[in-house]
Swiss-Prot record:
Mg(2+) binds at E30, Y76, E84. This is Pup--protein ligase. It comes from Corynebacterium urealyticum (strain ATCC 43042 / DSM 7109). The gene is pafA. Catalyzes the covalent attachment of the prokaryotic ubiquitin-like protein modifier Pup to the proteasomal substrate proteins, thereby targeting them for proteasomal degradation. This tagging system is termed pupylation. The ligation reaction involves the side-chain carboxylate of the C-terminal glutamate of Pup and the side-chain amino group of a substrate lysine. The lineage of its organism: Bacteria, Bacillati, Actinomycetota, Actinomycetes, Mycobacteriales. It catalyses: ATP + [prokaryotic ubiquitin-like protein]-L-glutamate + [protein]-L-lysine = ADP + phosphate + N(6)-([prokaryotic ubiquitin-like protein]-gamma-L-glutamyl)-[protein]-L-lysine. Keywords: ATP-binding, Ligase, Magnesium, Metal-binding, Nucleotide-binding, Ubl conjugation pathway. Pathway: Protein degradation; proteasomal Pup-dependent pathway; Protein modification; protein pupylation. The active site is at D78.
Length: 504
């Protein structure tokens, strides 16, 4: 089997024909950032103005605010003046972590240039990019997870098994949030205080095709960016944006294991919830994990019980799960060595709910790190949880600036754990993932910009514009090589007489 060449699609390593075990999966993250310009505590430019300034070098160079970067990720300005990065196609957990972090670094570089431009124009101030999910006006923006899954799995079956996991997953990977109730808001019937999840109050349905007006936990819009007869794209929009690499690894890694089990037909318990939206909001405010939620069966269960059951199944699954291939030192899929720490941390977090002592994970889980930070400041200064100074600390935790952001300060002090080295992140900023279709897109874009060729690029297509141009479709996201793309790149030296563009 040679899935990297595109001769075969991903790996049915074991299992039956009806229930193959997929240990190689295309996945990606879409992250929207909050943005603001502040000088001496006062806002200077509005979000629209500062976002336009942020993207001005991109527009000047490529004549578009919607481009693919040389690491094959997509950078664009989303609705509501939110800068957004969609990572390139990844096929292993640590690879995705690296490209998620690379996205932070790329948009922060734009913010630093914007600050220089503001200073030269006499406006001044800092440009803050916040990797969070809510603003002071009550708006929410997301961190969307994308997983390529088998078309053979019925959507109804998938949602009934996956929704209980996603609703209760905030226990192990929420980003944490200070919340103050306001009339007409989803939190109006709750007390002010700290909650585990930033997104819980902004979900309105379990599953639907909407994304904003009636925001669901799982979005069903069917855009697989692959062979639609074989695959669908699972689009999860309930997750929080995480600053912690260990929390992100737990969020993605646990989901990978649950999806593998569902696809393989593993026996999982029936925890189908009677009301996912009521459950997700109640769970977000209970740090015991013992809030009883109603099931469709008429019984009740606690989020801790539900997560314990999924965790136990994942432990058993990992013991018998086949290893993916490793070709030329690169994993084609997520190996046990990356998933074993995920399952171990998952269990430790749940143990903390049992004991009520979260100190064993207070450098690894975002909501625990933030809660400790906020409660420490409140205790030292005698502050109520509604104090505006604590709200500022909450926001500054999500500032991605390497020197100024509070999470990064904690990491330098050894109070927040990490997984990746700086070299891995730098490499991900400059190069596309080597094991997926993204490698072709990255090579194509690099060559086009070197030779000054005008191009049009999207997830499944590469095109050289002009009278003598050519186009190649890339339907297989697992194929990292393609002779037609090689020919296109070789032809660029003769065609490069126009300005390069890379429109998404």
């Amino acid at each position: 089997m040679s899935p990297v060449t595109g001769e075969e699609t991903p790996a049915e390593q074991q299992g039956t024909a009806d229930n193959p075990v997929y240990v190689r999966r295309i996945m990606g993250l879409e992250t929207e950032y909050g943005i603001t310009n502040v000088l001496d505590g006062t806002r200077r430019l509005g979000p629209d103005e500062v976002s336009r300034l942020l993207f001005s070098p991109i527009v000047e160079k490529y004549r578009s605010s919607n481009i693919f970067t040389e690491n094959a990720s997509r950078l664009y300005l989303d609705v509501g003046a939110h800068p957004e990065i969609a990572t390139a196609e990844c096929d292993s957990l640590h690879q995705l972590l690296a490209y998620d972090r690379a996205g932070d670094e790329l948009v922060q570089q734009l913010a630093s240039r914007a600050e220089e431009e503001l200073a030269s124009n006499g406006i001044g101030g800092n440009v803050f990019l916040l990797k969070n999910n809510t603003d002071s006006m009550g708006n929410s923006y997301g961190c969307h997870e994308n997983y390529l899954i088998s078309r053979n799995v019925l959507l109804k079956h998938l949602s009934s098994q996956l929704l209980p996991f996603l609703v209760t997953r905030q226990l192990i990977c929420g980003a944490g949030k200070l919340t103050i109730p306001s009339p007409g808001a989803p939190n109006e019937n709750f007390e002010a205080g700290f909650m585990m999840s930033q997104r819980a109050d902004y979900m309105w349905e379990g599953i639907s095709s909407a994304t904003t007006r009636s925001r669901p936990i799982i979005n069903t819009r069917d855009e697989p960016h692959a062979d639609s007869s074989k695959y669908r794209r699972l689009h999860v929009i309930v997750g929080d944006s995480n600053m912690s690499e260990t929390t992100t690894a737990l969020k993605i890694g646990s989901a990978l294991l649950v999806l593998e089990m569902i696809e393989a037909g593993a026996e999982l318990p029936n925890y189908e919830l009677a009301n996912e939206i009521r459950a997700i909001r109640d769970i977000a405010r209970d740090f015991t994990g013992l809030t009883e939620v109603k099931l469709r069966s008429g019984e009740t269960a606690t989020p801790l019980e539900i997560q314990r059951t999924f965790h136990a199944a994942a432990v058993h699954w990992l013991e018998h799960r086949p290893e993916p291939e490793c070709v030329d030192g690169r994993w084609l899929g997520t190996p046990r060595e990356q998933l074993a720490p995920v399952v171990e941390l998952w269990g430790r977090v749940l143990d903390c709910f049992e004991t009520g002592d979260f100190s064993p994970v207070d450098t690894e889980i975002d909501w625990v790190i933030k809660k400790k930070l906020l409660h420490g400041m409140a205790s030292r200064h005698g502050l109520e949880m509604t104090d505006p100074r604590l709200a500022q600390i909450d926001l500054r935790y999500h500032d991605i600036h390497p020197a100024r952001g509070l999470f990064n300060v904690l990491k330098r002090r050894g109070q927040a754990a990490s997984i990746l080295g700086e070299e891995q992140i730098r490499e991900a900023m400059d190069q596309a993932p080597a094991t997926t279709r993204a490698a072709l897109r990255g090579r194509f874009l690099t060559a086009a910009r070197e030779h000054g060729c005008a191009t049009t690029v999207d997830w499944m297509r590469l095109k050289i514009n002009g009278e003598f141009g050519s186009e190649v479709a890339l339907p297989n996201p697992f194929a990292a090589t393609d002779p037609q793309v090689d020919e296109m790149i070789a032809s660029m030296a003769d065609l490069g007489d126009t300005d390069a563009t890379a429109r998404g």
